[in-house]
């Protein structure tokens, strides 16, 4: 397994993995009446293949198998870039999904390298891939002089245990898309 910068050709896998991280319920909260998960998947694939969106392949690292299949992905970017990067998603939600999400809560802020999404396909779980992806994102954050930050659903104690084991610490509580979340950070070593 190797961790590499994603390429445009990985866009569909990136979209599927982001949706896996979000859960179907959360994805359906992002679409308007008469729209489906397939519609959301197409929008996310287009955003992942774009140059400037929070879900762009440019903001993504992928875990590749020996035969170059995508096993997992992690999407991360500088918190200060959230609004500029999110614009493409908000525009697509309005135009293609029939949903105005302009009032969505900010999940990050300036001063952190935000891990937006991390997921591994079910067939590749329990192999340390999520940990490897997270370590790579933490390293990228620290090389930029920033702590790595993320949100974890309070209903997902397994993910919280993993993040804690990798050095993340609780900062505060946040609400995001109707879910109670814990904001955690992994600071640069002194």
Q: Residue locations for each model-derived region?
A:
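Conserved GNAT-fold acetyl-CoA-binding loop/helix
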Residues: 25-48, 94
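A short helix-loop-beta-strand connector motif used in the catalytic cores of GNAT acetyltransferases and
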Residues: 47-62, 80-85, 114
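Conserved beta-strand in the GNAT
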Residues: 62, 69-78, 114, 119
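Conserved acyl-donor/pantetheine-binding loop and adjacent beta-alpha core of acyl/acetyltransferases
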Residues: 78-113, 117
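Conserved acetyl-CoA-binding loop-helix of GNAT-fold acetyltransferases
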Residues: 120, 126-139, 161-165
